[in-house]
Each structure stands twice: as C-alpha cells, then as structure tokens.
C-alpha cells in the first residue's frame, strides 16, 4: 500500500513538472487531463475528454485544452472528421515548423495518430510568408482495422 501511494506521488510530481516546464500552473483538473492524454495512444476530441470526465465542468475542460495548446503542451489536428483532435506534443516540441509532422486518420475506427517520426519536409514559401502550422493527414486503415 505504501509503495502505491509513493508511486502516485511521484507520478503527480512528474505531471506537475511537465506542466511547469510549459509555464502552466498546476491544478488538480489540469493534472488529471494531462494524465488522461498521456494514457491515450491516439489524438482525442474534446467530446472524448468530456466523456472521460463526465462530472467536470465542460468549460473548464475546454479552457484547460486551450491553455495546453497556447503553451505548446498539446497540438490540434483537423483530420477531416469535423471534430478537432488534441494530442500531446513531444517534450522537446516548440511547435515550430521543424516540429510539424504527419498524422494518420483511420477511416474505419476514426482514430487519429501522430506520426512523429515523419517530419514534414521544408517547403520554400514565397517571400514574407511564414508557416505557422501544416495540416498533413494521411487517411487509411490503422493496424487494428487492417487485420
């Protein structure tokens, strides 16, 4: 029993540290949402997060995600499903052009995955143009649906 409590305390400290490294004040709800996002193996919609935290105030969850996005803890993905998805950024991510990567959207199960090992190639833009975000989504069947 003591070991479990110690592990939970260490986990909370790690989550709080991850928030603080992004200049995000730690609150119980922010820690819970961060923990939830870490446990997911794919990007999730606001609706999925609301379903996971049914008793939480919806506006609090929305503001939490917007705070995470503003401080580069998560990035958003428009995968064409008409539901914006949220995924954790890598700890080293600064959401610059070099950090942009492809996403894979399964057209069967509707899950969206970050392909962080596939960076978007640098594109030469016209003079005085600056890329803020690239939305590159590959669609097909994920490993589970392709069986």
Locate predicted features:
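Short amphipathic alpha-helical elements of helix-turn-helix/winged-helix folds
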Residues: 18, 35-40
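Short capping segments at the starts of secondary-structure elements
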Residues: 26-29, 40-45
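Short alpha-helical segments that sit at the start of domains
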Residues: 5-31
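Basic amphipathic alpha-helical segments that dock to polyanions
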Residues: 61, 65-71
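Short, basic interhelical loop/turn and adjoining N-cap
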Residues: 55-59
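A short acidic, leucine-rich amphipathic alpha-helix
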Residues: 48-52
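Non-DNA-binding regulatory cores of transcription-related proteins
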Residues: 70-147
């Amino acid at each position: 029993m003591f070991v479990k409590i110690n592990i939970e305390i260490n986990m909370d400290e790690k989550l709080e540290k991850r928030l603080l490294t992004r200049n995000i004040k730690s609150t119980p709800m922010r820690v819970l949402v961060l923990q939830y996002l870490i446990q997911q193996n794919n990007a999730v919609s606001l609706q999925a997060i609301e379903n996971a935290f049914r008793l939480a105030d919806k506006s609090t969850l929305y503001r939490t995600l917007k705070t995470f996005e503003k401080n580069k803890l998560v990035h958003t993905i428009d995968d064409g499903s008409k539901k914006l998805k949220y995924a954790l950024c890598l700890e080293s991510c600064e959401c610059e052009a070099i950090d942009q990567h492809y996403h894979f959207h399964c057209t069967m199960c509707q899950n969206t995955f970050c392909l962080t090992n596939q960076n978007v190639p640098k594109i030469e833009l016209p003079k005085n143009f600056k890329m803020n975000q690239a939305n590159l989504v590959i669609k097909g069947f994920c490993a589970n649906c392709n069986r």
